[in-house]
Curated annotation (Swiss-Prot):
Substrate binds at residues 27-31, 77, 154, 209, 327. InterPro entries: UROD/MetE-like_sf (IPR038071), Uroporphyrinogen_deCO2ase_HemE (IPR006361), Uroporphyrinogen_deCOase (IPR000257). Belongs to the uroporphyrinogen decarboxylase family. The gene is hemE. Pfam families: URO-D (PF01208). This is Uroporphyrinogen decarboxylase. It is an enzyme of class 4 (lyase). Homodimer. The record marks 77 as: Transition state stabilizer. It comes from Nitrosococcus oceani (strain ATCC 19707 / BCRC 17464 / JCM 30415 / NCIMB 11848 / C-107).
Length: 357
């Protein structure tokens, strides 16, 4: 593999000195880019786009042609694992992802197997290999998965949910069935992330989108404990470099210290978190990634720049911060606002860094 020309992102995740704060954006390959919409139309549907390695590679690279981003994230979907388990993923207009065969009983859980990434998810592995070749060392490539709890939410509910009645009903009434499902998923995610690393991912991220829907006790027992198992099982060195692991629980600001105790390298934080306080909470245990409200990108470029400045200042001097949004970029944002953000972060963060940290 080509030598990495820009390792700012990886260094920041490991709290090593950098010349400026690195930035990438959740869902940076997405509908806000006209070139993405063009490829998406050519693919015909979202699932075809995800499962065609050449197209997934192309849309992964698109934002890097426009913006001076410090990392690429492979274009895929968090629901690839349940799809590979045979649940029949489809996308319904206006409703988002749905499953033809939800999992709601003990027997249905027991029937689930752990997918083989090189056969059942070969399209993801091929997209990673292809993208690494195309990147040619320009920036690191991020692999990812949904967390066991978040995957279980979709699998039990059969799609998105506002109240999580089905999965919480299962969790409270049949906790042993819920734990069995989460154990299978933790194993599947670990195998999947390790395969992504072998295929070329240089950092990996766990998206726990729905962890924030749980109480403190239930978050610990049904979400965090399984993410901790994955952190423990993920390969942490490849190609002579450390492979950082990022955990992101949306709405997880109350649990940062506990999350830092999993042994991960970085925590994603959303915009409800005070970055200065978060840094004090986690100390030197982990790096932090975030945390601009995605809606700031609807404001003027000057306001975007001001917000970037405030977030950089809130984190303060030294390495250990990767700038990102607090969640995915919205489809209706204008690309020039992203350009303004990336330029602002790179320019305004320089005074906060020295190589003698």
């Amino acid at each position: 593999m080509a030598e990495l020309k820009n390792d700012r992102f990886l260094r920041a995740l490991l709290r090593q000195p950098v010349d400026r704060t690195p930035i990438w954006i959740m869902r940076q390959a997405g509908r806000y880019l006209p070139e993405y919409r063009e490829v998406r139309a050519k693919a015909g549907d979202f699932l075809t786009l995800c499962t065609t390695p050449e197209l997934a590679c192309e849309v992964t690279l698109q934002p890097l042609r426009r913006f001076d981003l410090d990392a690429a994230i492979i274009f895929s979907d968090i629901l690839t694992i349940p799809h590979a388990m045979g649940l029949g993923l489809y996308f319904s207009k206006g409703e988002g992802p749905r499953f033809e065969r939800p999992v709601r009983t003990k027997n249905q859980v027991s029937a689930l197997g752990v997918p083989d990434p090189e056969s059942d998810l070969s399209y993801v592995m091929e997209a990673l290999r292809l993208t690494r070749r195309e990147l040619d060392g320009r920036v690191p490539l991020i692999g990812f998965s949904g967390s066991p709890w978040t995957l279980a939410c979709y699998m039990v509910e059969g799609g998105s949910s506002k109240d999580f009645a089905l999965i919480k009903g299962l969790m409270f009434e049949h906790p042993q069935v819920m734990h069995h499902l989460l154990e299978i998923l933790a194993q599947a995610v670990t195998v999947y992330l390790n395969a992504q690393i072998a295929a070329g991912a240089q950092a990996v991220m766990l998206f726990d989108t729905w962890g924030g829907a749980l109480s403190h006790r239930d978050y610990r027992d049904f979400s965090l404990s399984y993410m901790a198992r994955i952190v423990e099982g993920v390969v942490r060195e490849n190609e002579g470099r450390q492979v950082p692991v990022i955990l992101f629980t949306k709405g997880g600001g109350l649990w940062l210290e506990t999350m830092a105790g999993t042994g991960c390298d970085a925590l994603g934080v959303d915009w409800t978190v005070d970055l200065a306080k978060a840094r004090m909470q986690v100390g030197k245990q982990v790096a932090l990634q975030g945390n601009m409200d995605p809606c700031v990108l609807y404001a003027s470029s000057e306001r975007v720049r001001q917000e970037a400045s405030e977030i950089i200042k809130a984190y303060g001097a030294g390495s250990g911060h990767v700038f990102n949004l607090g969640h995915g970029i919205h489809p209706t944002v204008m690309p020039e606002k992203v350009a303004a953000l990336v330029d602002a972060v790179h320019e305004l963060s320089v005074p906060y860094h020295t190589y003698e940290e």
